[in-house]
Amino acid sequence: METVLILCSLLAPVVLASAAEKEKEKDPFYYDYQTLRIGGLVFAVVLFSVGILLILSRRCKCSFNQKPRAPGDEEAQVENLITTNAAEPQKAEN
């Protein structure tokens, strides 16, 4: 009986040590939010700076020239097409 008590008393620190080691292991769902926030802000600043540099450099241009149109210009074109189609005589099909 005494040997069983001695063995149990020797195993108790081992069991407690293994429980303490499990607590010390890193939780896979733990995130370092401070580092994540700083990394995101740095990434946003870099993208913002690249966008401003592209706008200011004026190297990003269209390959063809476009004339600026007035806001009602498209409506006038549609009305002209309608009136020209109505003015043309209908061809009779045989």
Curated annotation (Swiss-Prot):
Keyword Transport (UniProt): yes
GO biological process per UniProt: positive regulation of sodium ion export across plasma membrane; potassium ion transport; sodium ion transport
Transmembrane segments: 35-57
UniProt KW Acetylation keyword: no
Topology class, membrane: Single-pass type I membrane protein
Annotated localization: Cell membrane
Expression tissues: Expressed in the neuronal fibers of the medial part of lateral habenula nucleus, thalamus, hypothalamus, stria terminalis, zona incerta, amygdaloid body and cingulum, olfactory bulb, hippocampus, cerebral cortex and cerebellum. In the cerebellum there is a predominant expression pattern in the granule layer of lobules VI-IX of the posterior lobe. Detected in inner ear.
Signal peptide region: 1-17
Role summary: Associates with and regulates the activity of the sodium/potassium-transporting ATPase (NKA) which catalyzes the hydrolysis of ATP coupled with the exchange of Na(+) and K(+) ions across the plasma membrane. Decreases the apparent affinity of the transporter for Na(+). In addition to modulating NKA kinetics, may also function as a regulator of NKA localization to the plasma membrane.
Entries under PANTHER family matching the protein: FXYD DOMAIN-CONTAINING ION TRANSPORT REGULATOR 6-RELATED, SODIUM/POTASSIUM-TRANSPORTING ATPASE SUBUNIT GAMMA
Quaternary data: Regulatory subunit of the sodium/potassium-transporting ATPase which is composed of a catalytic alpha subunit, a non-catalytic beta subunit and an additional regulatory subunit. The regulatory subunit, a member of the FXYD protein family, modulates the enzymatic activity in a tissue- and isoform-specific way by changing affinities of the Na+/K+-ATPase toward Na(+), K(+) or ATP.
Protein name, UniProt field: FXYD domain-containing ion transport regulator 6
Record organism: Rattus norvegicus (Rat)
Gene behind the chain: Fxyd6
